[in-house]
């Protein structure tokens, strides 16, 4: 069984919004691109979200989504609430 990993690009407007929110909150983000993992000769695939590391906290984001997941996919907030969250940590 062979797993194929393809890196996906950040949606430019999403990255700009995240950079703006982080700049306004006076924090420095580290961006790590997500990927698509496909199992060869099947129709199975997994989309690994982009990671944004801020103050030792990993935020997960998907292209074309307004949700931000904190540490894992169980806890999410809206992108509009991110500034408030960053100021609270």
Give the positions of each predicted feature:
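Acidic, low-complexity, intrinsically disordered interaction modules
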Residues: 27-77
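Mixed-charge, Lys/Arg-enriched low-complexity segments
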Residues: 1-24, 28, 75-89
């Amino acid at each position: 069984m062979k797993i194929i990993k393809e890196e996906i690009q950040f949606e430019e407007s999403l990255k700009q919004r995240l950079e703006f929110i982080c700049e306004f909150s006076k924090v420095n983000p580290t961006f790590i691109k997500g990927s698509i993992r496909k199992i060869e000769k099947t129709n199975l695939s997994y989309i690994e979200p982009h990671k944004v590391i801020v103050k030792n906290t990993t935020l997960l984001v998907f292209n074309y989504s307004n949700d931000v997941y904190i540490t894992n996919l169980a806890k999410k907030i809206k992108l509009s609430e991110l500034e408030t969250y960053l100021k609270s940590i």
